[in-house]
Swiss-Prot record:
PANTHER family: URIDINE KINASE. InterPro entries: P-loop_NTPase, PRK/URK, Uridine_kinase, Uridine_kinase-like. It catalyses: uridine + ATP = UMP + ADP + H(+); cytidine + ATP = CMP + ADP + H(+). Belongs to the uridine kinase family. Keywords: ATP-binding, Cytoplasm, Kinase, Nucleotide-binding, Transferase. One of its GO terms (biological process) is UMP salvage. Its EC number is 2.7.1.48. CDD domains: UMPK (cd02023). Pathway: Pyrimidine metabolism; CTP biosynthesis via salvage pathway; CTP from cytidine: step 1/3; Pyrimidine metabolism; UMP biosynthesis via salvage pathway; UMP from uridine: step 1/1. The gene is udk. This is Uridine kinase. It is an enzyme of class 2 (transferase). GO terms for molecular function: ATP binding; cytidine kinase activity; uridine kinase activity.
Length: 213
């Protein structure tokens, strides 16, 4: 864990569609009143997928997005270190339909609390070292698959066939190889998804304690 007490960084990992975004947004909304609207922020690991603008669409589609090599953790670590030092950063914007970054970025200023959420956060020791608390969403894979199909078809313009094919070829195998083993690095393991009220309250209390340290 980082020794810096001016910025509390919380990492929320787990399978795709396990409830990471839901629990992150819930904690964000419920803590804003206590720490201030401008003192808490959420960073999604997906924003740090590699820039693939130099590749054709055919090549982009073939990328294994569930492997650590698909993500620019170097840039994510650099941004977190800058935020801890009190510097603003430009968070990339990623397009799920174009399978690459857009030309847009979002400015993030230093915060008292930064919530990270992403499937592979706990696989990288550099990221783990920057986090003050780590969470793993331990949601059954069959439930994750149902949620993923619904989300990707309705929100990301994909076909059910392509979602199921990707799940069989990369999502599940990479979960077993990388994501599931990273659960050992979690301080808190959350069953039953992002609506687990007890887990949310425990995590909020822990963040409040870290802020007072």
């Amino acid at each position: 864990m980082s020794d810096n007490n001016q910025c509390v960084i919380v990492g929320i990992a787990g399978a795709s569609a396990s409830g990471k975004s839901l629990i992150a947004s819930t904690i964000y909304n419920e803590l804003r009143a206590k720490v201030g609207d401008h003192q808490i922020g959420v960073i999604t690991e997906d924003c740090y997928y590699n820039d693939q603008s130099h590749l054709s669409m055919e090549e982009r589609v073939k990328t294994n997005y569930d492997h650590p090599s698909a993500l620019d953790h170097d840039l994510l670590c650099e941004h977190l270190e800058k935020l801890v030092r009190g510097e603003a950063v430009e968070v990339p914007e990623y397009s799920y339909t174009e399978h690459t970054r857009t030309s847009n970025t979002t400015t993030m200023t230093p915060k008292k609390v930064i919530i990270l959420e992403g499937i592979l956060l706990l696989t990288d020791p550099r990221l783990r070292d920057l986090m003050h608390a780590t969470v793993f969403m331990d949601t059954p894979l069959d439930i994750c698959l149902l949620r993923r199909v619904k989300r990707d078809v309705e929100e990301r313009g994909r076909t059910m066939e392509s979602v199921l094919k990707q799940y069989q070829q990369t999502v599940r195998p990479m979960f077993m190889q990388f994501i599931e083993p990273s659960k050992q690095y979690a301080d808190i393991i959350v069953p039953r998804g992002g609506k687990n009220r007890i887990a949310i309250d425990v995590l909020k209390a822990h963040i409040a304690k870290l802020l007072k340290a």
